[in-house]
Amino acid sequence: MRKIAIIGAMAEEVERLASHLENRQTRQHAGSTFHSGHLHGVEVVILQSGIGKVNAAVGTTQLLEAYQPDAVINTGSAGGFGVDLDVGDVVISSEVRHHDVDAVVFGYEYGQVPQMPAAYAPDPHLVNVARECIEGLGELRVAEGLICTGDIFMADKAAVDQARERFPSMLAAEMEAAAIAQTCHLYGCPFVVIRALSDIAGKESDLSFQAFIEKAATHSAMMVEAMVKRLGTAS
């Protein structure tokens, strides 16, 4: 691949990768920050979108229009929902859904935006590359499954229980991925979501998030950097 885009919501989620760019250039527009340069010989643009679905969609649209990448990797932190998952574990998306959209009365699935797919499937090649990179990162525990998105931080037990009931197979919840996936779907751009867990949903999530965001950001960045290197070698 000639050009890879990486998207994270917060500075903590993108700065490690951005600091490794050669010939780094930074620009800001409409609330989004773009870092461009080369990583392991691959042309890369890194977007810090801001938190939440609207910020993610706006930033991703700007990114796709201005830079026209061959693929998008969404990285950063998430809250874990899988019973066997722990802080620092990495989740690769098998599919991505909204968990806070309700148009069921019109015949849509819960979580489905009208006239859009109920779930967004990541690019199989990008998922395979992510799997291959796991072998070289022995210290990371990695799972693959459903990642759900909503404009809510999962610290409330009632919200956590409701999400578990509606999406029993969900491994991770966060606040941007489905908006990024939906935008990529509309533009026909391949994507994958790679998230490291900063907290386990419902278990003092607000406290553990602050304590472990750096660990989660480091683990997700390690995975993404390994993917960029492998994708560059294969191109």
From Swiss-Prot:
Catalytic residue list: E13, D199
Pfam families, alphabetized: PNP_UDP_1
A single cellular component GO annotation: cytosol
Pathway(s) annotated for this protein in UniProt: Amino-acid biosynthesis; L-methionine biosynthesis via salvage pathway; S-methyl-5-thio-alpha-D-ribose 1-phosphate from S-methyl-5'-thioadenosine (hydrolase route): step 1/2
GO terms (BP aspect): L-methionine salvage from methylthioadenosine; L-methionine salvage from S-adenosylmethionine; nucleoside catabolic process
Class in the EC hierarchy, top level: hydrolase
Catalytic activity field: S-adenosyl-L-homocysteine + H2O = S-(5-deoxy-D-ribos-5-yl)-L-homocysteine + adenine; S-methyl-5'-thioadenosine + H2O = 5-(methylsulfanyl)-D-ribose + adenine; 5'-deoxyadenosine + H2O = 5-deoxy-D-ribose + adenine
One term of GO molecular function: adenosylhomocysteine nucleosidase activity
Binding-site positions, substrate: G79, M154, M175, E176
Enzyme nomenclature, EC number: 3.2.2.9
Record bears the keyword Metal-binding: no
Keywords: Amino-acid biosynthesis, Hydrolase, Methionine biosynthesis
Cited function: Catalyzes the irreversible cleavage of the glycosidic bond in both 5'-methylthioadenosine (MTA) and S-adenosylhomocysteine (SAH/AdoHcy) to adenine and the corresponding thioribose, 5'-methylthioribose and S-ribosylhomocysteine, respectively. Also cleaves 5'-deoxyadenosine, a toxic by-product of radical S-adenosylmethionine (SAM) enzymes, into 5-deoxyribose and adenine.
Family note: Belongs to the PNP/UDP phosphorylase family. MtnN subfamily.
Protein name: 5'-methylthioadenosine/S-adenosylhomocysteine nucleosidase
UniProt source species: Chromohalobacter salexigens (strain ATCC BAA-138 / DSM 3043 / CIP 106854 / NCIMB 13768 / 1H11)
High-level lineage: Bacteria, Pseudomonadati, Pseudomonadota, Gammaproteobacteria, Oceanospirillales
